[in-house]
C-alpha cells in the first residue's frame, strides 16, 4: 500500500508544494466521484469510495503541518501518539500550568488585553516549535521531531 506522499506523487519530506497537493487531490476526487460510478458494479462503487476516503484522509494529513510532521515520524518508526510517551520536560509542564492559570484568570475577569497577550505568546511558541520540528525532520532526527510534536499536541 502506498503512503500518502506516494499517493499524491509528492516527495516524502516536511516542505511540500501545497498547490500541488491541492491539484492532485482534486484530480483524484474527480476520478472517483460518485457520479462517475452510477452504472458501475457494487464492487467498483465500493472501490471508488475507498479511494475517495483515502484521498480525504491523505489530504487532511498532508495539508496540516502538525499532522504531516507526525505522519513523517510514524513512517520512520517514531509514533507520536503512543501512550508509552508519558514523560514531558518539567519546565514545559510548568509553563503549561502557568498559561492555563493565567488563561482561566483572564477569562474569569474578562481581561481582554491579557487574553490577547497570551494568544500572541502561544502563537510565538507554536511557530518556534514548528521550526524545531521542520529542522529535526530535515536532519532525519525523528525522535526530536516526535517529542516536539507531542508538546504541540499537549
Protein language model annotation of sequence segments:
Residues 1-154:
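C-terminal accessory/regulatory regions appended to core domains
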Amino acid at each position: 500500500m502506498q503512503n500518502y506522499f506516494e499517493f499524491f506523487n509528492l516527495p516524502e519530506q516536511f516542505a511540500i508544494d501545497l498547490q500541488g497537493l491541492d491539484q492532485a487531490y482534486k484530480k483524484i476526487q474527480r476520478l472517483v466521484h460518485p457520479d462517475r460510478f452510477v452504472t458501475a458494479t457494487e464492487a467498483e462503487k465500493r472501490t471508488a469510495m475507498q479511494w475517495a476516503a483515502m484521498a480525504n484522509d491523505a489530504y487532511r494529513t498532508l495539508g496540516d503541518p502538525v499532522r504531516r510532521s507526525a505522519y513523517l515520524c510514524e513512517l520512520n518508526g517514531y509514533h507520536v501518539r503512543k501512550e508509552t510517551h508519558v514523560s514531558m520536560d518539567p519546565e514545559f509542564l510548568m509553563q503549561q500550568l502557568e498559561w492555563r492559570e493565567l488563561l482561566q484568570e483572564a477569562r474569569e475577569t474578562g481581561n481582554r488585553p491579557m487574553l490577547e497577550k497570551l494568544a500572541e505568546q502561544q502563537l510565538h511558541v507554536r511557530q518556534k516549535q514548528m521550526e524545531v520540528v521542520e529542522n529535526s525532520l530535515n536532519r532525519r532526527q525523528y525522535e526530536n521531531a516526535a517529542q516536539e510534536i507531542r508538546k504541540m499536541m499537549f
